[in-house]
Structures are given as C-alpha cells and as structure tokens.
Amino acid sequence: IPRIALTQSGGLDATQARSLWQQGFDPKRPMPPVIVSYDSTLYNLSLPNSRNDLLKESLSYLANISGNLSITSETVNHALSSEDMVATWPSDTKEGWWRYRLKGSTLLGHDPADPLKTPVDAAKIQSFYQKWYTPDAMTLIIVGNVDARSVAEQINKTFGELKGKRETPAPVPTLSPLRAEAVSIMTDAVRQDRLSIMWDTPWQPIRESAALLRYWRADLAREALFWHIQQELTKNNAKDIGLGFDCRVLFLRAQCAINVESPNDKLNANLGTVARELAKVRDKGLPEEEFNALVAQKNLELQKLFATYGRTDTDILISQRLRSLQNQVVDIAPEQYQRLRQSFLNSLSVEMLNQDLRQQLSQDMALILLQPKGEPEFNMKDLQATWDSIMAPVTAAATSVETDESHPEVTDIPPVQ
C-alpha cells in the first residue's frame, strides 16, 4: 500500500506531490518517506521553514492517501515497477539477533519485509486498505513553527471527510520474555565481538505522576551505573574494551543492555572486569559524591531545558512523541515537566538510588554475544561460568523489580560510547 501511495499524487498535481516527498530526502539526515513495521505504517514529510502553504498541500496529500487511494491492477503494477522507497523497522528483519528475539512472539509470520506473493490480488489489497486504513486509527503529528489554531482547523476540514471505522480490534504485538541464558549469534551487524549483558521486564504504561517518578528514579539509577562503570574503566586504564548502554521498549517488553565491545581473545577477562564492578555496585551502592555530581548535572540540564528544546531537530521531536504514544506515556507540557522534574531531583537521595540499583542488578540476566560471521564460535559456557562466579552470590534483597524497572524508555543515557 505505501508503494502505491508513493506513485500517486493524492489530489495534487504530480509535480507538487513529488516535491513533498523530495523534501524528506535530506542527505545529512536521511529519513525514508515511509517506514513499515509489524503494527504500524509511518508516512514522513519534511517541509521548508515558513512555508505554511505547503503544509496545507501536505495535509491534503496525506488525507487522500489515507482514505482515497486508487487500488487497481494497473496502479498495483505501476507501483511494483517503480523504485521501492519504503523502509522497514527493524531495517533488517532477518538479522540474527532480531530473529532470536522473536522466538515465541506473536510477531512471527508478520515480517514487514517478506516478499510479495505473486500474482498480487488488487481486490485483496483494497479490502485490507478499507479494513485497516480507517481515520479512527490514524495519528497525525506536526512539529514546527506553526499556528496551532489554524492548523487544527485545517486538519478538521481536510481529514473530517474520511470515512470508515475499525470493526475488528488490531491484535496487540508482543515479544516473549527474554530468556536468561548465554547465547552466541553470528551476524553481519558487528565488526568485532559485542557482548550484551541484558535484562527485560513487562512494560507498564506511564499515565500518572507516581509512575513517572518511579520511572525517572530507575532511569537515573541506570545512568549513574553507566557513568560509574565508565569512570572505573578509565581510572584503571582498561584497554581493548568499549562500553555502551541501551534501554528501550520493544512491543510491551522493557529491555536494557550493557554492551561490551572486545577483541575475541580478551572477552572473558573483560566480562569479568565489568561483572566485578556491577557486583560491587549491587552490594555496596554508589558513593555519595558520584550521586551528588549526577544530580548537579541533571539540575544544570533542567535549567537549559527550553534552550535545548528549541534547538532540537524536528525529526527527533517527532521520534520522541511517537515513542511516547507507542509506549502509552502521558504527554507533559515542558513547563509541567520542568516543575515535576525539579521536585523529583530535590527529593532524591543516594539511598533511594542505591535501592533501585540493587533491585535492577539482582535480576537474572542474559549474556548475548554478537560475533562477526566467519569467526569461530565462542564457548558461551566459559562466559556464563565467569559471570556466575562473580554475580551468583545475590542476597534476597530484591525479589520484585518490575515496579521500578519496567520503564526504561526516553532515557538520558547515551545509547553508545
């Protein structure tokens, strides 16, 4: 359907329609005009500043492809013979780690990158389009210097004529819990070994302030942990080890990973180095001076909130808003965010942060090793033994971690180092 949409002018003349898509092709920040995933399709338009006339055309175009797409044998064949500009998320749905993560999931059998079965039946595509492309299931996000009132009027006028309503609820895509095991995966996605110490929990939506404050506390604990390990590695002059931290929500599973990049022959030793620091933090907590430094940094960032917000690119703002919608995170105005965040930082203590860290680091974790294809497979039993020898003596301090640990998204932690 998106390929058909990209070949039609949506009520505009062909030149106007092409120019709208071309605005989205910024060589410095490439964004595909359409991204298809397992449960959603995202159409992207990027317009020049101060061209509100183009905004009106864009809304008209999007409304047309959303409800008035022409689907016939001719338009299908034309789309198939045209350049395919539609991207998928993930970009490589066949990559080894992603296929491993999908095991036991409801997503299996719904690969957005699967090749079309030929011959293509236009009538079936039309039926799918009418069933799922309904206005009650659409979300429109506009970011930029626009007049909110006039844009709202344009939206109501342009999209108000669309017909149709979902009769069948869309199935909710979910991932299975991540198994706490040691696994080696051969992949083209890495050039050297990358070991991920990974844990996940069910994701809980954030709909009120108490849940938001719990999430912030858990997230700040993770950030404190990341910087502590990074500083310890630097202080000890650790060689041949790269450290990254990645937290995200994937289809109702909240997933965090400490990523260790290492030469193959030093992998076991480097895992031991990181595990010893994790065990030390779990058992003894972070020193108060590190806590104070982190809170001071967060207070400084909060003072610069509006300046940072004003400099943030529109595609990043849209990505943040999309994540909030997908993960059912309540929308907060910047002013309210600033007040809540300041109150949170003022009330936080090192004891609260260390309790969160103890909970998070007391979970069963998976060891996921990504290896470049062609490399001999690493003996994962050795890595598991190293990990267990350091991390196994866990006290019964934290049995339930889902309350605080279930919100690792929209994080301040840098995704890669």
Predicted features by range, described:
Residues 2-11, 25-26, 48, 60-71, ...:
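Sec-exported extracytoplasmic/periplasmic mature domains
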Residues 27-29, 38-42, 78, 120, ...:
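Extracytoplasmic
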Residues 39, 133-135, 195-207, 249-256, ...:
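Short acidic (Asp/Glu) and glycine-rich catalytic loops that position anionic groups and cofactors
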Residues 141, 147-202, 206-207, 211, ...:
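Proteolytic maturation boundary segments
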Residues 211-288:
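Structured mid-domain segments that build the active-site/substrate or prosthetic-cofactor binding neighborhood
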